[in-house]
Amino acid sequence: VGILELTRGEKGTQGTPAERQAECVAAARLMDLSWRGQLGLPDGELADTPPFAHALAAALRTVRPRVLVVPHWHDRHPDHFGTYHLTKRAIHLAALKKADLGGDPWRVQRVLLYQGNSDISANVLVDIGSVMTEWEAAIRAHTSQFAGGYVSETVTPEIIERRQGRLTYWGTLLRVKYAEPFEAEEPLLLDPLGL
């Protein structure tokens, strides 16, 4: 499992790019990621543009992920819905044999959309009760985001409690303590014995 950050968050209200970078490194350690990358696209400007899509497609060919987890297209944050549309183009480009991106073509098998700042029509729920301590520690590693109180409608001093409440709600649907919701755009094939 790895994370590719598209920007350095340089235009964010809280924290400097250096602070945010250090926080990302700390959170990655807490999550025990196998890799972490930084694409360096401009913060506040993520959109489905050919240069951005080529950069992301080249990264997909290098990293070769089977599954991508990206922000939902309905998120209120412009960079989040921009990431969704950019990712869809990059996935297509990465698979094209004649796309001049370097490396061998790569086809991502599955895209899951995560719940950010808006509601989603979740059709995949993952029991995360066993990793909630790590989940909270990874969020708290982003200390600059919690300095100074209220930042926006969604980034408040109560963000962890609010997100835990949301995870508790989704967990009740599975009869577990916490569940992370995702939306799969395509049907998932399940083992009927696993139901």
Q: What is each model feature region?
A:
Residues 1-63, 183, 192-195:
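Active-site rim/loop-helix segments in enzyme catalytic domains that contact anionic ligands
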Residues 47-195:
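Metal-dependent de-N-acetylase/amidase catalytic core
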